[in-house]
């Protein structure tokens, strides 16, 4: 270990400033009081979550759902859904559709999905599109299916875009349109849908060279509209 060079001036020690110590102690006291308050609220209301922020409500409910604690999940989602929280309405619809923690009730599930979809929750729009397309809970309604799938697709959902491509290819509720079928399938493929590539290739075989160029241009037009819909917009699931 080298000794300091005696020729170098030594820096005098920093003077002690009691103000910093007081501020530090103050922060510690505030943190302790906050922790005591939260613990007190939790003890006083062990079955209530109203003292928590909404974002934390949702996080707790979603964790409970994924861990299989359906009773807790339903309780919190129901509280938030009653306050018109669209994300909670979607989750409660999902659980009601499947009968998780609540009696299975297709009509109530659809009503909740529609409330969430009205607030642009993309997952709710997609599920309603699937329900009306496949007749999962109600008789098929291709007009409703197309409307909800378009809403979800224009918010960038690849599965919704793929299903729209199928509808146009098969002519479900409309005349078959290979250009629209290719365009929507291409959009879904570019957005990450693996299955959409098969739909796109199936539509491609029905198009001559000129129509193929038209279909590619239509896909670009759709992508541009999706960009306009999603850029600068708040996350649909939180509206």
Give the residues covered by each predicted segment.
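N-terminal Lys/Arg-rich, disordered targeting/topogenic segments
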Residues: 1-16
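N-terminal Sec-pathway targeting helices
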Residues: 13-27
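N-terminal leader/linker segments that initiate helical-solenoid repeat arrays
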Residues: 30-71, 75
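Short helix-capping/linker turns of helical repeat alpha-solenoids
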Residues: 52, 65-69, 82-85, 98-100, ...
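Hydrophobic face of amphipathic alpha-helices that form TPR/SEL1-like repeat modules
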Residues: 57-64, 75-80, 89-98, 125-134, ...
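Structural signature of tandem alpha-helical TPR/SEL1-like repeats
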Residues: 66-75, 103-115, 139-148, 175-183, ...
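Canonical positions in the second alpha-helix
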Residues: 79-80, 115-116, 150-152, 187-188
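Terminal, low-structured helical/coil segments at or just beyond the last alpha-helical repeat
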Residues: 194-239
């Amino acid at each position: 270990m080298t000794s300091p060079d005696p020729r170098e001036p030594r820096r005098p020690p920093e003077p002690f400033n009691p103000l910093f110590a007081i501020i530090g102690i103050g922060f510690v006291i505030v943190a302790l009081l906050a922790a005591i308050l939260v613990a007190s609220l939790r003890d006083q209301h062990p079955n209530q979550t109203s003292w928590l922020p909404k974002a934390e409500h949702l996080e707790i409910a979603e964790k409970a759902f994924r861990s299989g604690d359906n009773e807790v999940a339903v309780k919190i989602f129901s509280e938030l859904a009653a306050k018109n929280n669209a994300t909670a309405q979607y989750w409660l619809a999902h659980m009601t559709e499947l009968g998780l923690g609540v009696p299975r009730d297709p009509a109530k599930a659809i009503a909740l999905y529609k409330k969430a979809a009205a607030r642009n929750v993309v997952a709710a729009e997609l599920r309603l599109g699937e329900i009306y397309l496949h007749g999962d809970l109600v008789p098929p309604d291709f007009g409703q299916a197309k409307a909800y799938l378009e809403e979800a697709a224009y918010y960038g959902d690849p599965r919704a875009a793929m299903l729209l491509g199928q509808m146009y290819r098969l002519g479900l509720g409309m005349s078959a349109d290979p250009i629209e079928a290719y365009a929507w399938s291409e959009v879904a493929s570019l957005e990450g849908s693996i299955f959409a590539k098969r739909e796109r290739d199936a539509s491609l075989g029905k198009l001559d060279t000129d129509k193929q160029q038209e279909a590619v241009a239509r896909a670009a037009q759709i992508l541009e509209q999706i960009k306009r819909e999603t850029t600068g917009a708040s996350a649909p699931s939180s509206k």
